């Protein structure tokens, strides 16, 4: 199917962020390099990754607060919201845009978020924001900054020298 169907811009960012969330460095770098070959803009890819991490962080906080529970049926995850009014309010304020979307996307993001601690996601988000700022400086090539970010995030904080 991948050979016959042209990916949309949203699916390109989603696929890259998915391999990042799975901490699959070879697949992540392979996909990133393919996207660079296809002349995708590193800045736009980074924006997609930032949004993904921000959503995962919000979902992780909801999981830790007990507002969101995950149950598994094989490889499928089923998110269940608490019936408490404060849970609904928290969900609406943190991930209201996800609640309006397809439930599968919410389930996939919640599953990914459950594989991280809040501290990890906060560090990842901080590093993407720092990289975003460095992209605007223009001192280092955008693709090199992005590749170093991907390596650093997946390897767990060991800084790539740029």
Give the residues covered by each predicted segment.
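C-terminal alpha-helical interaction modules of replication/initiation AAA+ assemblies
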Residues: 12-15, 19, 27-162
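Long, charge-dense, solvent-exposed interaction surfaces that engage phosphate-rich ligands
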Residues: 1-11, 19
